[in-house]
Amino acid sequence: MAEMGSKGVTAGKIASNVQKKLTRAQEKVLQKLGKADETKDEQFEQCVQNFNKQLTEGTRLQKDLRTYLASVKAMHEASKKLSECLQEVYEPEWPGRDEANKIAENNDLLWMDYHQKLVDQALLTMDTYLGQFPDIKSRIAKRGRKLVDYDSARHHYESLQTAKKKDEAKIAKPVSLLEKAAPQWCQGKLQAHLVAQTNLLRNQAEEELIKAQKVFEEMNVDLQEELPSLWNSRVGFYVNTFQSIAGLEENFHKEMSKLNQNLNDVLVSLEKQHGSNTFTVKAQPSDNAPEKGNKSPSPPPDGSPAATPEIRVNHEPEPASGASPGATIPKSPSQLRKGPPVPPPPKHTPSKEMKQEQILSLFDDAFVPEISVTTPSQFEAPGPFSEQASLLDLDFEPLPPVASPVKAPTPSGQSIPWDLWEPTESQAGILPSGEPSSAEGSFAVAWPSQTAEPGPAQPAEASEVVGGAQEPGETAASEATSSSLPAVVVETFSATVNGAVEGSAGTGRLDLPPGFMFKVQAQHDYTATDTDELQLKAGDVVLVIPFQNPEEQDEGWLMGVKESDWNQHKELEKCRGVFPENFTERVQ
């Protein structure tokens, strides 16, 4: 009997719950269709929105805090392994081994204490704070269901009140029929029964309305008080949580700093006792910096003449590459210069060497000179003039030009238009080949008034080739015809050379810094990264000078002074500096 009773109670409860769900669903449908009004509380809805926002922020903070704790634990494990590695490599006979082991143990304990305090003062507090949200969330949902029940009971009661007159008409109609069929005494009892039944339904609907309203108001009042209070409590919770985290982290780093200082003292004492075995870390140059060492210099950019080991632009012999030290001298990290970003490499034009056939072709009758404006040519004085101190010192009267079928060779390969050449008569039969003719004096008149320094000795091979190309009978004719250049040609040639005879010690050298080698022009902007570097802009002209100490020169770097600074200050020590060679182009 007890089992049957419990089953009946359970079945009745289930039926009641199903009935409530159906009633609520019906009420929501009517509200959505607009056939039933809905009770709304805008203030409470705002509190619910704040509650959902607060729950979202708290959940995110809890997730991030757990991630932070996981990172602390991982850092603890990494620090522990590093300390164990130090203990393993620390030899027993080394001083300070016990201190190092103690520092490692304290380091491990400090990490454990930091992690545990974070869990106690931050994570557990966060869990407690978020623990109240599920209960309030369920109460908000229950309050919404009770509001639907209240609206349903209210609508049912209002419908009974509205249908009161209709029910009375339905009750009166059967009475009129009964009056004809039933005796008089039965009609009064039947009417009283129908009225009592209608009143009972109305009373039940009213009781349900009052009950639903009471339950809803109780829950609504509680939530109206708790939700604003919970929303305002978030400020204090955030402050306490982050203050705890910041304080714990500050204390942790202070203690860790002390341990690291103690470990550093132990290692310093170890280094002092093993000072002879100090390991020096050598910095490696970066990929984008110009490499340093004994490597071949980078080829010059387009438009600049390629210098050969025999003859340079200033007609000074260039030291052979074999004279450089064979091994790279290591430098301290302070001496290693980090190079600037490498600009796009220019296209390189391979230098052309003068072959013997080409030298011989200069004296051939079929040789047609061409004008070359891209590469300034270097003037090489003919053999007879190279032994003289100055061309202006030749005190010979010029001879009138005479026709000669022999074409005068161009100085140092300088191209001169064919129409500017004038035929002269050969003086081979008149003047001896060993004596300088007066035609040489006429040739010297067209040159600028500069005293030529004795140039370096030319290679033996070139001398033999030139000497072999001219027979004894043709030597005097060639010397005579070399002076037959008109004044216009001579002036054009000297303007093209533009002071290429770098060996002269005239007035052109007075405005140049001591040890001047050549000029370069910046092709790209370069920002100086050190006090001893030059700040360059595209188009700046730099006067290149040698390093005071050749061992300090790094591969890819040159020493120089900007031409504008030199012309303004004339102070080499203050104006000079180093700059990357690949940012410039040689112009002279």
UniProtKB/Swiss-Prot annotation:
Quaternary structure, from the entry: Heterodimer with AMPH. Binds SH3GLB1. Interacts (via SH3 domain) with DNM1. Interacts with SYNJ1. Interacts (via SH3 domain) with DNM2. Interacts with CLTC. Interacts with AP2A2. Interacts with AP2B1. Interacts with MYC (via N-terminal transactivation domain); the interaction requires the integrity of the conserved MYC box regions 1 and 2. Interacts with BIN2. Interacts with SNX4. Interacts (via BAR domain) with BACE1. Binds (via BAR domain) F-actin.
Modified residues annotated as N-acetylalanine in this record: A2
Protein's name according to its UniProt entry: Myc box-dependent-interacting protein 1
Taxonomic source organism: Mus musculus
Coiled coil spans: 15-42, 193-274
InterPro entries named among the record's database cross-references: AH/BAR_dom_sf, Amphiphysin, Amphiphysin-2_SH3, Amphiphysin_2, BAR_dom, SH3-like_dom_sf, SH3_domain
Post-translational modification: Phosphorylated by protein kinase C.
A GO BP annotation: positive regulation of astrocyte differentiation
Gene: Bin1
